[in-house]
Swiss-Prot record:
It catalyses: Hydrolysis of terminal, non-reducing beta-D-glucosyl residues with release of beta-D-glucose. The keyword Hydrolase applies. Its EC number is 3.2.1.21. It comes from the Eukaryota. It comes from Oryza sativa subsp. japonica (Rice). The lineage of its organism: Eukaryota, Viridiplantae, Streptophyta, Embryophyta, Tracheophyta. Glycans are attached at N63, N114, N363, N416, N417. This is Beta-glucosidase 30.
Length: 500
């Protein structure tokens, strides 16, 4: 008996024990609506590698990760998982796990090396994504494509500050149109931006993500930036870029291609630290400043009232024409969820040291009276709290007119400090996804229009500021050889998604 077959048999026995004990009994893909989509996700910079190959130009992340000290252990995505060369092997793994869909992003500078049409379209990049899309479809899966996952072209960052300038809107729409034109005959699910909150707040408020801008009183390492204004300006230009791309797609491509388009928004769920009115207010402000910042404009046409009232002229305004274009600019919403926090009201910040982080006047923590809200994960900012996902989905139904939702990221990590046999035994990940899926199921039964669930992530990969320390994948990747190994969770997913 081969090693692979032996491991598969052992895992089948392990699953059998769980089912006999009633732990996961009768809970499978058939517990969900027939058209529910199950998948897993990735991102170009975190996976592809080949950062100077195939005609690709540099992005802000290529630049940022090469600055010593910016990333843990000075890791980078130069090679990453070498998905650029190994994607056929990896798509076969997805098929083995019975996935319905694969979520991935298109690297802007692999299509437009200097970010602009004036620099020419890179035919090698187009060919790569055509081949990837075709292979995903040939394996019976749905490509779920993100147009922008934080990798702004370095040329545009150098030319006019990237998303700090409204000039980015036209450049982004040009890039999006190349994607629609080249791939839209086969891609039926588009998302314009992944987690614009993270890009804006971490790249321009904290300075810990590319392009690494912040006020000096936030961090001496940034060198340049304004944490009180730049996150809001960048987010505003993202809204305008998103809306313009959606408008283009709807008028020029959607009538014939018959696809759908939306935005992926990340948020936490929040619980009052105590039952006071002040802390309940802190919960709402916390939601407004991370979730409402992006949901309110695309659903209601403007930023939340708390943001508008408290930020004053630091928050850009939409013109009536822009508001009309932004409002309703989605066919579905992608929601990324990882954790829940307690929220406690705090006094207004020092007016001389304003920053996005303090503007919501709420302190968020995973602990109350020394006890965590849920088990603390390897990355200590995350707490495993499955009911939070259900509450978030119900809140979205109430506040945002029950939109079509895909849970586009949900996952748990472990550290890169275990032996291979230990790394493959990830029962905590099985429990994590099973419980979160049960709460998604509860939300559906309560009328929330959830249409899909994507794990984060397909394979262990480059995790931004933490480099390769955190492992979120269903597949273990040996960092020296890049060989892929299936974790126990991948076999659980395979069985969970098996069709009768």
């Amino acid at each position: 008996m081969g090693i692979r077959m032996g491991r598969r048999l052992l895992f089948t026995l392990f699953l059998g024990a769980l089912f006999c004990n009633g732990v996961y009994a009768k809970f499978t893909r058939y517990s969900f609506p027939k058209d529910f989509i199950f998948g897993t996700g990735s991102a170009a910079y975190q996976y592809e590698g080949a950062y100077k190959e195939g005609g690709k130009g540099p992005s802000v992340w290529d630049n940022f990760t090469h600055i010593p000290g910016k990333i843990l252990n000075n890791d980078n995505g130069d090679v990453a998982n070498d998905f650029y060369h190994r994607y056929k092997e990896d798509v076969s793994l997805l098929k083995d796990m019975n996935m319905d869909a694969f979520r991935f992003s298109i690297a802007w500078t692999r299509i437009l090396p200097n970010g602009s049409l004036s620099g020419g379209i890179n035919k090698e990049g187009v060919a790569f994504y055509n081949s990837l899309i075709n292979d995903v479809i040939a394996k019976g899966m749905i490509p779920f494509v993100t147009i922008f996952h934080w990798d702004t072209p370095l040329a545009l960052e150098s030319k006019y500050g990237g998303f700090l300038s409204e000039d980015i809107v036209k450049e982004y729409v040009d890039f999006a149109e190349v994607c629609f034109r080249e791939f839209g005959d086969r891609v039926k699910y588009w998302t314009t931006f992944n987690e614009p909150f993270t890009y804006s707040a971490y790249g321009y408020g904290k300075g810990v993500f590319a392009p690494g801008r912040c006020s000096s009183y936030v961090s001496k390492s940034c060198g340049v930036g304004d944490s009180s204004r730049e996150p809001y300006l960048v987010a505003h230009h993202i809204h305008l870029s998103h809306a313009a791309a959606v408008q283009l797609y709807r008028t020029k491509y959607q009538p014939t291609q018959k696809g759908q388009i939306g935005m992926v928004v990340v948020t936490h769920w929040f619980v009052p630290y105590d039952n006071s009115d002040a802390d309940r207010g802190a919960v709402q402000r916390s939601l407004d400043f991370i979730y409402g910042w992006f949901m309110d404009p695309i659903v209601h046409g403007d930023y939340p009232g708390t943001m508008r009232g408290w930020l004053g002229n630091r928050l850009p305004e939409f013109t009536p024409e822009q508001s009309a274009m932004v409002k309703g600019s989605y066919d579905f919403i992608g929601v990324n969820y990882y954790t829940t926090y307690y929220a406690k009201s705090i006094p207004p910040p020092n007016s001389n040291e304003l920053s996005y982080d303090l503007d919501n006047r709420a302190n968020t923590t995973g602990f109350r009276n020394g006890k965590p809200i849920g088990p603390q994960e390897f990355t200590p900012i995350f707490f495993n709290y499955p009911p939070g996902l259900r509450e978030l989905l119900l809140y979205t139904k109430r506040r945002y007119n029950n939109p079509t939702i895909y849970v586009t990221e949900n996952g748990i990590d472990e550290g890169n400090n275990s032996t291979l046999p230990e790394a493959l035994k990830d029962g905590h990940r099985i429990e994590f996804h099973s419980k979160h899926l049960q709460f998604v199921n509860h939300a559906i039964k309560n009328g929330v229009n959830v249409k899909g669930y994507f794990t984060w992530t397909f394979m262990d990969c480059f995790e931004w500021g933490d480099g390769y320390l955190d492992r979120f994948g269903l597949i273990y990747v040996d960092r020296k050889t890049l060989k892929r190994y299936r974790k126990e969770s991948s076999y659980w997913i395979e069985d969970f998604l098996k069709r009768h």
